[in-house]
């Protein structure tokens, strides 16, 4: 049998037969389906790149009960009460169809053993049974009291409140909770939305590539990643030694791809390392089907391109130090590889310092045309073609894969950032000292979170190095009244706390998360709430609701024998989950008032797209990916409240500030849109006014016609009505019966603005 290269720690040539446990995925023990017999080749090991395929093949399937691994099961007679009840789907799109059901079917409904798709009540059952199974196993494992009857009473109430749209896990929880990936493997990685990795320690040990390859692994698992540039100018670069070794075969696997990136980056960060050359022959070709998800593989080209770009960036720089630009470039190149590989979308945030001009100019195409996908001209700026437009590079850029923000401190002067913000919306601002010192701003300084080093890509969760986000959300506008809302908080909180009981497969992450037990219970639909009930009523719900969550955290932490959570509340941006439950996202006002066109994206050949076309919706090729992508345009009706163009920049940030004061002890995700003609000049004043009142702040110009097939499009009443009258009911039954592809799940905690679409 061939040797398996998993580490190159000693001299660049050592060979080991087993992957390092800190890098091994929860499924890493599964045997590869490919029998490799060529003794001249060295393999990189790993979990299959398309993890659903590998896990499905490895999971025991001889049992009739596909949920045999769950320790807690609801009674059938209780669940069947909901079988014929229609969920309150959000956002009508004509003829009784809704964006809510569309998003549920395409993202969160899993295929069952018989080939059909989960109905909504079945998904709710899976989530609740998975949640209470974790609690039960924890209690029994630690010999703690467990009352089955009491658990059933609680689980039934949690079920009903989820079914009626009063709370929900984030999209990743709807997709993964109660599955073999989570409950069968006792691994919470698939439930985590985002994380943070610091480069501050890259020069301290023998694993300087760690933040870069861990970023790649997290991204390939759908975890959005924040990272910083603290390691800039601490790590000397070296030139690998050309020794003409045999090529190393890269396995068609997540770990194989990640390990190849580690080996290549490390060869430039440690002395006396051999240059590495790879053989990509085992990676499935472009266009090959991806089992389960129904998409197609991108082939080895994205990985080849990543390796080539990394070599071009780091070659022949011996004696130089790794710069902040290098750190961001490596992170962005990894993000582009993940996007291009059709594995996941990518969400990254890079945190730099406010006086680093190189960092601030990373997305300035006049200074860095290659990063933004343009050919550099003789004057150093973008090359201008005969059509007077900038010439695009064949391979495209990579700088777009992260949102870039600066680490700030309260009282600093950040007026100089406004120019970049107006130009491209960046940088955002993250007040690191406020995150370390304060929880809710209504409460006194406590310095409990002094270890915080960064934030997740959407800005709602301050995090330590290697820490992940555990999120959950509640929908106040779907609750009957304050007491109904207050009761619902118990079950939303309990979901988040339950997820903290499961480890990930990363020891470095478990060390932090078991100490902090950080969760983020988010309120969603707040603009709607304010428009209907007013700001003071929201303040009451937030303040008393926060106290209620803290009360429950004391009770459940004591029973479970774990620490109380360091922080418990947040405001996440929300995304497709808010569409399912029919509320506005996070603390943002809707893009449009009342009615508008909403576009959604599907792959060519997806039966859902065919069903939508047959129902009268406009379906056309995706202009960004016409060979494989489709765009469906839906006439959508949302809440009849002010759209974001009708709300001032100041009011938007003020709502975030109230949430930071009275609800969120973590942070608040706020992307404040502004009118570029009338409000751009006010940005410095807004930053100064809310300095010390929010922990994170980013801006985005509100412009019409920014790009073709935009997610939200304003149309005239006549055009809207014509499209509305044209559609007929979608044949959902045939899709639920099994025609629809496996759900895609949801990455991160994002709105459409946070992730780079595949």
Language-model-detected regions and their locations in the chain:
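Extended catalytic cores of very large enzyme megasubunits
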Residues: 2-758
